[in-house]
Amino acid sequence: MTRCDVLVVGGTHGNEINGAWLVDQWRDQHDLLDAAGLSLALEIGNPEARTANRRYVDRDLNRCFTADLLNQGGQEQELQRARQLLAWHGPDGATPCRVALDLHSTTAAMGSCLVVYGRRPADLALAARVQGALGLPIYLHEADAAQTGFLVEQWPCGLVIEVGPVPQGVLDALVVRQTRIALETCCQELAAARAGTGRDPHNLVVHRHLGSVDLPRDQRDCAAAMVHPQLQGQDWRPLMDGAAMFELPRGGTVPLQADEGETWPLFINEAAYAEKRIAFSLTRREVWPIDPSWGQALEQLMG
């Protein structure tokens, strides 16, 4: 069995074209990407949706990777693609990969950041070391039963690289550059883990998911307010209870009443989340000490 170090996926969402464009370029010109000596498998996540310039054809591919969905025999296009990616590069696939890196973009003002799902030690080690190298903020998404089935969770280690803002379907040179830098840094840290030369930062700063907030709804179940101008574009900035959250049609304000103290909103007004009834997500900023077992798990995986 031939093994591969890293699965790199672009275009998991078909209208997020920057990561997919990079995958195309790297396939044609291998020297454009410094993989730090690692072997890569490069895949377009959802080719059919990319051709149609849509997020997905039948359902969100990045919510398809749950055991129930994968095993129930559904024939929706994205379920078939999820099974195919696992058959090719999953832990038990024809060419299994140790790590999955999923390239995404967002219409929200998230900058360049990492998304981690749950608290797997190898994930935390890689995220911490990339944060130490680049200073990227980290969104820790966990404990949300409404949002599950993410691609990278099916691999022993995996992160999402998220860059924005950029409109859907728009190729943006800065987004491409930031995505490449983050990916190359991930590869460098994985190679260092293999060599036993990886260095942990003093701590890990995460923004831990608390929950998501929908727009107010009217009797027709339609949006009855908008994200407030004072909140728009303020991703990664603290928000206190009572702060302006939504603006009503006549100019009134709906304040935040989360009873959570200081929270940090993310993915504010992300276009793709309107169908999921998410105007933004609330997080809490936390600083964690580095657990040596994280790095040990990553080194064992890459050894």
From Swiss-Prot:
Keyword flag Manganese: no
Cofactor: binding details: Binds 1 zinc ion per subunit.
Cofactor(s) listed in the protein's UniProt record: Zn(2+)
Residues given in the record as Zn(2+) binding sites: H13, E16, H104
InterPro entries linked to this entry: AspA/AstE_fam (IPR050178), Aspartoacylase (IPR016708), AstE_AspA_cat (IPR055438), Aste_AspA_hybrid_dom (IPR007036)
Alphabetical list of Pfam families matching this protein: AstE_AspA_cat, AstE_AspA_hybrid
A molecular function GO annotation: hydrolase activity, acting on ester bonds
Enzyme nomenclature, EC number: 3.5.1.15
Residues annotated for substrate binding in this entry: R55, N62, R63, E162, Y273
UniProt keyword list: Hydrolase, Metal-binding, Zinc
GO cellular component: cytosol
Entry-linked NCBIfam families: PRK02259.1 (NF002601)
HAMAP family the record matches: Aspartoacylase
Stated family: Belongs to the AspA/AstE family. Aspartoacylase subfamily.
PANTHER family (UniProt xref): ASPARTOACYLASE, SUCCINYLGLUTAMATE DESUCCINYLASE
Protein name: Probable aspartoacylase
Organism field: Parasynechococcus marenigrum (strain WH8102)
